[in-house]
């Protein structure tokens, strides 16, 4: 079983995360930001990851530190994963009504994000849409994953939810075990 626990305790956030990469999509997520809980739940469900996440953040200031630090701990959990025999690459194109999200991933040890997300609104509930790209940057830098994404659509809820669903599907694909693979790199290491 590829299961990991990560804690982060700073002056801004206190986070406890449990991740089972080989899960069934069970989740219990409490960040204090209802829409963020919703899209993280979509990530877990569509990625078939069991995810337990308890966060106490400085939301009296804003949601930036909470979103950023969740990206950090989730990234660290995936970075802990043994890279031998994984498929390494994953991708997904997910529609949600008028919105469409495309995500492609390389778990190759080289953190880099190319994201095309232009919000139409500043907020979805108490969630700041400017934090969407920052979440993925925080995740990528800590997971050491190359991540590309593009989102189109009109409804902000649909756009961000489609993006997190596509993220889950692509991560599920990339983390799948294929015994034929060994280390998927001509270098011999990831």
From Swiss-Prot:
The keyword Amino-acid biosynthesis applies. GO terms for molecular function: imidazoleglycerol-phosphate dehydratase activity. Its main location: cytoplasm. It is found in: Cytoplasm. The keyword Lyase applies. Pfam families: IGPD. It comes from the Archaea. Pathway: Amino-acid biosynthesis; L-histidine biosynthesis; L-histidine from 5-phospho-alpha-D-ribose 1-diphosphate: step 6/9. Its EC number is 4.2.1.19. GO terms for biological process: L-histidine biosynthetic process. It catalyses: D-erythro-1-(imidazol-4-yl)glycerol 3-phosphate = 3-(imidazol-4-yl)-2-oxopropyl phosphate + H2O. GO terms for cellular component: cytoplasm. Keywords: Amino-acid biosynthesis, Cytoplasm, Histidine biosynthesis, Lyase. InterPro entries: IGPD_sf, ImidazoleglycerolP_deHydtase, ImidazoleglycerP_deHydtase_CS, Ribosomal_Su5_D2-typ_SF. Belongs to the imidazoleglycerol-phosphate dehydratase family. NCBIfam families: PRK00951.2-1, PRK00951.2-3, PRK00951.2-4. This is Imidazoleglycerol-phosphate dehydratase. It comes from Methanococcus maripaludis (strain DSM 14266 / JCM 13030 / NBRC 101832 / S2 / LL). The gene is hisB.
């Amino acid at each position: 079983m590829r299961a990991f626990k990560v804690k982060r305790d700073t002056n801004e956030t206190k986070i406890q995360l449990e991740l089972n990469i080989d899960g069934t999509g069970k989740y219990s997520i409490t960040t204090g930001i209802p829409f963020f809980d919703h899209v993280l739940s979509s990530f877990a469900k569509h990625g078939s990851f069991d995810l337990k996440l308890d966060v106490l953040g400085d939301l009296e200031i804003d949601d930036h530190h909470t979103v950023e630090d969740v990206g950090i701990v989730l990234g660290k959990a995936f970075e802990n994963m043994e890279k031998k025999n994984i498929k390494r690459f994953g991708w997904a194109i997910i529609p949600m009504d008028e919105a469409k999200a495309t995500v492609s991933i390389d778990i190759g040890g080289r953190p880099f994000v190319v994201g095309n997300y232009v919000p139409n609104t500043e907020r979805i509930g108490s969630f700041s849409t400017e934090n969407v790209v920052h979440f993925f940057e925080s995740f990528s830098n800590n997971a050491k994953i190359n991540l590309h994404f593009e989102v189109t659509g009109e409804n902000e809820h649909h756009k961000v939810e489609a993006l997190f669903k596509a993220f889950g599907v692509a991560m599920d694909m990339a983390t799948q075990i294929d015994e034929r693979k060994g280390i998927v790199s001509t270098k011999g290491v990831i």
